[in-house]
Amino acid sequence: MAVGKNKRISKGKKGGKKKAADPFAKKDWYDIKAPSIFSVRNVGKTLVSRTQGTKIASEGLKHRVFEISLADLQNDEDHAYRKIRLRAEDVQGKNVLTNFWGMDFTTDKLRSLVRKWQTLIEAHVDVKTTDNYTLRMFCIAFTKKRQNQNKKTSYAQSSQIRQIRRKMREIMTTQAASCDLKELVRKFIPEMIGREIEKATSSIYPLQNVFIRKVKILKAPKFDLGKLMEACSW
């Protein structure tokens, strides 16, 4: 009878089972600091791997983008439908200093606005602030019934939609070109631009639910620590 290895009998491994390494052991927590335009400054924490050789922890944090609800930043649930994007610009000790990097609506808010018997009007424009930020602003609006109107529908004509869109672009450009990024964000929070559009277009067709729906930063100026410190009031 041939004598060979019995594969069913397993040998014990040398050294026993290897202990699993804790993934958080080589990482550090940093505090995220929001700009001074918002009511709440400490908005959360973020993880990053510790400095090892040429790999510096602070460099791994720079340009990281955080998405935070405006309700948390303003301590007001009425702003829960807005999402604010903040980008890490610099690291001071254990604090990550951020700056505004965009804005968006939550999907549920956007869907709740769309209804039957009305016209949805959208416009977008590229604008430049006084501190050389290039932004793309998206505006959304809905038509509403005129006073004493019995008709169920409130549809705007194509010529009226074009006029409203032109007015939207004009107002967005004027508002952004006359101020810096910090002042512009201050206008977004109470929806000042939306109210101005609603007022300016009332003679063309009455509008409701006029919002700056989305803001994207296309181009930012060269990094300036002094301006960042001023924005964060540090």
Curated annotation (Swiss-Prot):
<dbReference type="GO" id="GO:0003735">
    <property type="term" value="F:structural constituent of ribosome"/>
</dbReference>
<dbReference type="GO" id="GO:0006412">
    <property type="term" value="P:translation"/>
</dbReference>
<keyword id="KW-0687">Ribonucleoprotein</keyword>
<dbReference type="Pfam" id="PF01015">
    <property type="entry name" value="Ribosomal_S3Ae"/>
</dbReference>
<feature type="compositionally biased region" description="Basic residues">
    <location>
        <begin position="1"/>
        <end position="18"/>
    </location>
</feature>
<comment type="similarity">
    <text>Belongs to the eukaryotic ribosomal protein eS1 family.</text>
</comment>
<comment type="subunit">
    <text>Component of the small ribosomal subunit. Mature ribosomes consist of a small (40S) and a large (60S) subunit. The 40S subunit contains about 33 different proteins and 1 molecule of RNA (18S). The 60S subunit contains about 49 different proteins and 3 molecules of RNA (25S, 5.8S and 5S).</text>
</comment>
<keyword id="KW-0963">Cytoplasm</keyword>
<dbReference type="GO" id="GO:0022627">
    <property type="term" value="C:cytosolic small ribosomal subunit"/>
</dbReference>
<dbReference type="InterPro" id="IPR001593">
    <property type="entry name" value="Ribosomal_eS1"/>
</dbReference>
<keyword id="KW-0689">Ribosomal protein</keyword>
<feature type="region of interest" description="Disordered">
    <location>
        <begin position="1"/>
        <end position="20"/>
    </location>
</feature>
<dbReference type="InterPro" id="IPR018281">
    <property type="entry name" value="Ribosomal_eS1_CS"/>
</dbReference>
<dbReference type="InterPro" id="IPR027500">
    <property type="entry name" value="Ribosomal_eS1_euk"/>
</dbReference>
<protein>
    <recommendedName>
        <fullName>Small ribosomal subunit protein eS1y</fullName>
    </recommendedName>
</protein>
